[in-house]
Amino acid sequence: MEYAHIMPEDIFKNPEVKVYVEAGNSCLGALGFTEHGRPHAKRCSNYARNILEALDYDTRTCELAAIAGYLHDIGNTVNRVDHAHSGAIMAFTLLTRMNMPPEEIAIICSAIGHHDEKTAFPVNAVSAAL
């Protein structure tokens, strides 16, 4: 099966992603949290990519970190509680629909699912950077 080579820019400009990022930001705003919209998503994307680049990881791993960084808070659309887990499931659905290779989806979803401040654990390089 032929899979798509999804780049961070594909995620940044995806209209569905924009809706989820902004919906999560709206939910958090109602709960009294600071900004968690596209500026936050882009900062996290850049930080995750830059960390792995500084550690000399390969280009694709750095790109996957950028994607995970951008998507990491979309689960706030569902609820702040367990947002890492719901976000990983949302990312799985989105990236599968975009035809990303399962091996890459697994890395991204693991990173998102393990990023919560209470249950975080660095299960791979991308999750450590995130």
Range-by-range predicted roles:
Residues 1-20, 27:
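Non-catalytic interface/linker regions that flank or bridge core catalytic/transmembrane domains
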Residues 3-5, 36, 40, 83-85, ...:
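Histidine (H) residue identity feature
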Residues 30, 54-130:
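Divalent metal-dependent catalytic cores for phosphoryl transfer on phosphate-bearing substrates
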Residues 18-53, 70-77:
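Active-site flanking loop/helix segments enriched in acidic
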Residues 11-18, 35-42, 59, 85, ...:
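Alpha-helix N-cap/helix-start motif at coil-to-helix transitions, marked by capping-box chemistry
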